[in-house]
Amino acid sequence: MWLATPYFLPTWSVRRSLRRAASKGLDVRLLLTGPRTDHPSVRYAGHRYYPRLLRAGVRIFEYQPCFLHLKMAVVDDWVSVGSCNFDHWNLRFNLEANIEALDPPLTAAVVASFERDFAQSEEVDLAHWHARPLWRRVKQRIWGWLDRLVVNFLDRRD
């Protein structure tokens, strides 16, 4: 189960599914945007989910060469490619679309694309995560808190 998205703010159910799959021994990998991003605040807000995912066995890769604006997923022979960022904004509020396919040649092409991108990414592990500088931790806390506040406010409007 490999997932690529530039804005990683998944819903609780998506995070739970990723953790459960990884804890069962499945190869769960996230390909996320690295330091070159158009919305640093969103990147920092999404970092709050890293520790639990890493402890569950999810592998997290941050793409280094440029801004990653890729949105795709592959699970076995199933592929999803499109405009949905797989975050709580797109899954709850925005109108986005993906195309899904069960097509072995397409799956092979998507897997090859993922493998090329993983090779150009920095893998985040728990040791790396715990060694990050204080200023980054502060940014992650602030943006994570603001994101949670906005989502909770918008959820109450329904």
Which residues are covered by each model-predicted region?
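PLD/PLD-like phosphodiesterase catalytic module centered on the HKD motif
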Residues: W2-D158
